[in-house]
Each structure stands twice: as C-alpha cells, then as structure tokens.
Regions:
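Interfacial juxtamembrane loops and adjacent helix segments
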Residues: 113-229
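Perimembrane helix-loop-helix junctions
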Residues: 290-299, 321-352
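Transmembrane-helix signature of polytopic, membrane-embedded enzymes
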Residues: 13-17, 71, 223-226, 245-265
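Short acidic/glycine- and proline-prone juxtamembrane loop motifs at membrane-interface regions
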Residues: 273-280
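Membrane-interface alpha helices of multi-pass inner-membrane proteins
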Residues: 269-271, 300-316, 320-327, 350
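Transmembrane helical bundles and short interhelical boundary loops of multi-pass, membrane-embedded
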Residues: 23-50, 353-354, 361-372, 518-557
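Transmembrane-helix motifs of polytopic, lipid-linked glycan transferases
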Residues: 60, 230-254
Length: 557
C-alpha cells in the first residue's frame, strides 16, 4: 500500500525534498555537461556542486516563504523579489532594451547631477563597462557567411543570430558573455584607455530615482561601475516588488491573474533592470488591481490618480487613457470625497501638468547637446506619417495586422530577451499557456455570491486594453517608423504586458461560464504562486543558460 506523503512527519517530507533537490541538481549538471560540452570549459565538480547548491537554496527559500510569509500578497511579494533577484544576475550587464542609456542617466543622477550636459563624461570604469558589454550584445557579436563542414566537406552557410555562444572550428574555444566579464575585470591591467563616454540623449529624472538610490548605496559600499549596475537593478526591483505587493493587497478579484503576470519572466526581466519599465509596469498592475475593488473610497481614488500621473511622466500622452477607467466605477460604488468627473479632471490635469513640466525641465536644463536627430533618421517624420495614415486608413490597418502576425501577436514573444536578440523557444511556447492557466484559476468559484466585478468593469478594462494596444502601435508607427513603411518599427512584447493582464479577467469570465471550474478561490490562490514562482525560476535558469552555457553555435570557416 503506497505511503501518503501528507501523513509523513514534516521533517521527513522536507528531508526527502532535500534529497530530491540534490538528485535533480546532479542530473541537471549532467545534462549541461553532456549536451553543451561544459566539461571543456568548467570543472565537472564545480558545475555539479553549483547546480545542486542552487536547487537547495531555492528549496530553502520556498520553505521560508511557506513558513513565514503570511497572506497572499506577502507570499507573492517575497516570491517576486526573490525570483527577480535571479533575473537581475542571470541577465548580463546592459542587456535589457535601452539599458545602456538608462545606466548612464541613472549613474549621473546617483552622483547628484539632475541636469543634462553632453560635455560631462563618466569615470573610466564606466567607459570600460560599456566597452565590454555593448547593448544588443548578441546582435553585436553575430556573424554570417559560408564555411566548409569538416565531416562532409560540403559548403555550409552559417548565421549566428540568436546565439550568445559561438565556437569557431570544431575544437575552437567557445566565445561568449564570459569573455566580456573577463575583459571588464581585467581593465586595471590594460594599457589602453577607453574612449570617453558622455551623457546620453535621455532627459528624465523621476523614473530613474530608485535605480539612482541603489547606485549611490553601491558606491558608498565601495563598488565600481559593475557593482553600481547591480545595486541599481536591485533597488529598481524593490520598487517593482512594492508596487506589485500593493496591487495584490488591493485586488479583490482575479488575484491569480495578477500574480501570474507579475511573476512572468518578461515582467521580472524588466522589473530587475535599470529600465523605468520596472515602476511603469508596477503602476499599470496597481491601477488594474484597483479596478477589481467593489467600492472606491478616497484612498483608492488617490492611489489610482497618483499611479496615473506617474505613468504619464515615464510615457506621456498615450497613458492619458488611464484617466478613463475612473468612469467604470458606478455611482453607487463611488464613496470618495468629490465626484468622479472631478477626480478624472484632476487626474487628466495632473498628468498633463507633469508631462509639460517634464518636457520643459528636459529642455531648460539641457546643455551642450548638438541638434538631436530623429531616431530612425530623416526617413522618420511624424507629421508626414500621420498624414499618410489619414490618407490611407486601410493600408495602415493592413500594416498593423501584418506587424502583429509577423510577431506572433507579441503573446508568442514572451521569451524574447536581450534587445530582442535572444529568443528562448521554451518560454515563447509556454508563456501563453501560463496566461491561460492564470485565467483558468482566476475563473475559480468566488467566495461571495454576488458576481463582481461587473460586466461594466471587466468589459471596460478589456476595451481599454485594446484601445491602449492600438494606441501603442499607432504611436510607434508615427514617431519611430519611416513614412509609408508596411510594418511598425520598435514594438516589443513588454509593451503589451498590461494589455494581457487587462484581458485576463474577461477570459476568466468566459471560462467560468463555459467550463465551470470546480476549484475554489482559496485553492486557486494557493496554487498560482508556487506554480508561477517555479516557472520564473526556470525562466531565469534558461536565461543564464543561453548566455553562459549553451546552445553553442559552431562556425566552420
């Protein structure tokens, strides 16, 4: 008769878990050593002990969360921060989109410079860091050509796009991100002096403050440019975690959907970077969480308005759409001081005020910059593109639809990391399945008999998501895409994370009416965090693997 694990003493169960983790670590290391030829680069003992120790630490972290974190929001916040730490270190320096510019601006702010001076340069340590880790590292190290296969003697075309690790010749050394670390760490013994690095074309301050605090603390502790990068990432992650924790605490419905999006590898990849998307995404998730509250008091309205104003500092104009959801709260549900139109007007006025103030500040305190060319060159012209769109609406719709189709509607690119140059197929394939699982668990039987949120809230949020997605595409088409081009330049999956979250409640309602899941709300919430945390850990491991372990592209010259 089989032994039921639940009937075993807790100490025995955890002891078995420790043994299983160690065994899995050994098997995992063996897979890396065999499939990626890791024995030629690293000692087998180091790999085996490292993999086993990592899984034991993850198991210990899981035990601590289960034992000490009380409540759904607390458990979710701790998991978000711990999983985010893995992404902060698995992701190599400056490999988040635009992180090189974000690093330079954050570094300047951390040294007390709140203006923008193109003649101001950075320490040599920073210049060495940017030299060793160029943005879009995989693209920067991509090669293509025709070589001869030594086994068959036939000519064979090669293209290393999408591979961070390359091996030139069957017995050649594997080249990859580790070489960049070695290059940077050896800068003290190099004779050459790096080219000076000046301030970037980036004129924001407030969105970079969390990262600047982290950099300042790292500098106080004696760290150099690389340590400042990780310090900034960690404090940025802390800001993302706090916003997510507040969102989970305020959400009254569909909390599995929120936890799943927050723990999605793409969310953690951005949250644990120097990008202002860390706080931007956190504010999006917070505003959507507040829409699940049945009644709004003054505090709820104030938090929503503050988040709405902040997102307009980071991404102006398009984010004015987030003023409108205030009207999704019915009059009978509104208990804040002041009427809804006044709050909406205040949010709109505040958002416009900070937008104009940010633009003025970025111009008034800008020094020694030459004429800033449009991104994309002279072929990009917003006025001409807008006129082209108005003259050719059907062609524009075709361009938008074609862009979505070419990019798997961006829901199939949840595993596209780096500067869109490092695809991880497993995460691309499973990302939509995780969102579907979140919708299924969010469709669980509700505790209360009344059906809430109402169709007005759920449908309104879904409509907002679609309008926001169309607006994001239109903005990129008008401001970043050459006039008349048949596809949109610059769109990325991270822009649509808040869209998927806004659509998940509507999908959950549909699933609840069709398949009627028997799982209760309590069980759904108990299951979602461990499942998504494990998925996030696996995503961080895959990110590390693709940059440092394999696959390795063998180039035959």
């Amino acid at each position: 008769m089989p032994i039921k694990l639940q009937k075993l003493p807790a100490a025995v169960r955890w002891g078995l878990a420790v043994l299983c983790a160690a065994a899995c670590g050994v098997l995992w290391a063996y897979y890396w050593r065999v499939f990626f030829g890791l024995d030629n680069r690293v000692s087998p003992l180091v790999v085996t002990l490292g993999c086993a120790a990592f899984l034991e630490v993850c198991l210990l972290a899981g035990y601590c969360v289960r034992r000490f974190a009380k409540g759904f929001a607390a458990k979710g916040a701790v998991c978000i921060f711990l999983c985010g730490l893995l992404f902060a270190f698995a992701n190599p320096p400056l490999q988040t989109p635009d992180e090189a510019d974000h690093y330079l601006r954050t570094y300047a702010i951390s040294t007390g410079h709140f203006d923008f001076d193109a003649s101001r340069t950075y320490p040599d340590d920073v210049a060495y860091l940017l030299e060793a880790f160029p943005g879009a590292w995989v693209n920067a190290h991509t090669s293509a050509g025709v070589g001869t296969d030594p086994d068959t003697g036939a000519e064979k075309a090669y293209n290393t796009a999408g591979y961070a690790l390359k091996q030139y010749g069957k017995d050649g050394a594997v080249q990859g991100m580790a070489d960049s670390f070695a290059l940077y760490l050896a800068h003290d013994v190099r004779d050459s002096v790096p080219d000076p690095v000046s301030e970037p074309v980036s004129f924001l301050v407030i969105p970079f403050l969390p990262g600047a605090v982290g950099m300042a603390l790292a500098r106080l502790l004696g760290f150099g440019a690389l340590g400042c990068l990780y310090g900034g990432r960690i404090v940025n992650l802390l800001a993302y975690t706090l916003l997510c924790a507040l969102a989970l605490a305020k959400a009254e419905r569909y909390r599995p959907a929120f936890a799943a999006i927050m723990l999605l590898p793409m969310s953690l990849f951005m949250g644990a970077s120097l990008s202002y998307d860390a706080t931007l995404l956190g504010c999006y998730y917070l505003m959507l969480a507040l829409l699940t509250r049945k009644e709004w008091n003054t505090q709820t309205a104030g938090i929503y308005t503050a988040a709405c104003i902040f997102v307009n500092i980071a991404k102006p104009y398009l984010n004015l759409l987030w003023v409108l959801p205030i009207f999704l709260v019915a009059k009978r549900e509104w208990h804040a001081k002041g009427r809804r139109p006044l709050w909406a007007l205040g949010g709109f006025g505040g958002a416009m005020a900070v937008t104009l103030l940010t633009e003025w500040y970025g111009t008034a305190f800008r020094y020694n910059y030459p004429i800033i060319e449009r991104q994309g060159g002279s072929t990009v012209n917003g006025g001409e593109q807008l006129a082209f769109v108005l003259r050719n609406p059907l062609r524009t719709i075709a361009a938008f639809w074609g862009t979505l189709g070419e990019n798997d509607f961006f829901i199939g690119q949840l595993g596209l990391f780096g500067w869109k140059d490092l695809p991880i197929s497993f995460l691309n394939l499973t990302g939509p399945l995780v969102l579907l699982l979140a919708a299924l668990l969010a469709a669980a039987q509700q505790k209360r008999a009344d059906a809430f949120p109402t169709r007005r809230r759920v449908g309104g949020a879904a409509l907002l998501a679609l309008v926001y997605a169309a607006g994001a595409m239109a903005a990129m088409y008008i401001t970043y895409t050459p006039v008349g081009m048949v596809r949109i330049v610059g769109l990325q999956a991270r822009y649509f994370l808040c869209v998927w979250l806004a659509l998940l409640p509507a999908l959950a309602v549909l699933l609840r009416k069709t398949i009627r899941p028997a799982i209760t709300e309590e069980k759904a919430e108990a299951a979602i965090i461990p499942l998504c945390a494990c998925y996030a850990v696996f995503g961080a491991v895959l990110l590390f693997q693709h940059y440092f372990v394999g696959p390795v592209y063998v180039v035959y010259a």
